[in-house]
Amino acid sequence: KDRPWKYQDLADAMRAINSEDECNDTYGRIRMYQALLLKNPTGIKIPSERTVYRVMDEIGLVHRPKRKPNGITKADREARKSDDLLKREFKADKPLEKCVTDITEIKAKDGKLYVSAIFDCFDSSVLGLAMETNMKATLCEHTLDNAYLAHPDLRGAIVHSDRGRQYTSETYRQALSKYGIIQSMNSDGGRCHDNARCESMWARMKSELLYDRYNTESLTTDELRVLIWRYFISYWNNRRICSANGGLPPMIKRQRYYQSLGLAA
C-alpha cells in the first residue's frame, strides 16, 4: 500500500500561496519560504529553504528569469544639479527618511506609457505613482503630488533621482520646494548604478507582472495603467513578499515599525 507523501500538506500550502495573487508564481525558494513563515499555516512544520525548493521543484512551482530594463531619462547638461546626499547608502532606519524615484517606459498598443514612482528606502513601499503618455516634468510633479497627498509626513525627506532633465526642471524643483522635500541626485549622470535601487524595482515589476504574461503591445495605455496601479498599490505594498524586508510586505514592515514605537501607521 502506498504511503502518503509526507510533504503533501506543505505542497498544498505552497499551491495556495502561489494562487493567491497572479504574480505569486514568480516566487523562488527564498520568497516561498518567507511566505510560509509569514502565513504560518496551521498544522504544518515549515522545513528548511532547501526542502522548500525540493518540494517546489517536485510540484512544478518554478519562477521565470528576469529581464532588466534600461534607464530612459536623459541628462540636461546645462541645468543646475543637486548634490548626491545618499552616496549609494540606500538603507533607511525609519519610514519617510530616504526615497528614490525614477521613470520607466512600457510599449502599448496606442503608444508608450511612462511610469513614475517614488519608493521608500525603509521598506521598498511605493509612496507615489503617476503614469502619462509623455515624459514631461509634470509626470514627476504628479508623482510628488500623489506621494505627499498620501504621506504628508514626507516633508523633510530626501528624494534621490538620476540627473534626467525632468528632475533638473524648474517644475520639479518647485514641487519639491512646495512640499519641503530635499532633492538628491546621482553624483554623475553616467553612473547608472547610483540608481540601481529603482532599476531593480522596475525589473521586478516587468518580470512579475508583464513578461511572459501579457503582450503589452496588444494592450492600451489605459489598460496598462490599471494593471500597474493594482500591482504596485495593492499587491506590491500590501501582499508581495519582499526578501529585503526579511520576508515582509512593505506595509507590514512599516506597521510593525510603528507598533514598536507605540504608534499607529
Question: Where does each model-flagged region fall?
Answer:
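Active-site beta-loop-alpha junctions of metal-dependent nucleic acid enzymes
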Residues: 107, 111, 129-152, 168
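RNase H-like two-metal-ion nuclease catalytic core shared by retroviral integrases
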Residues: 5, 72-75, 161-163, 169-173, ...
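Basic, flexible linker segments flanking DNA-binding modules
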Residues: 1-94, 192, 249-259
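An active-site-proximal beta-strand-loop segment
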Residues: 88-127, 133-135
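C-terminal domain-tail junction helix/linker
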Residues: 177-179, 203-265
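Residue-level detector of anion-binding/catalytic polar loops
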Residues: 62, 181-182
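Mobile genetic element proteins and their domesticated derivatives, centered on retroelements
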Residues: 14, 32, 52, 56, ...
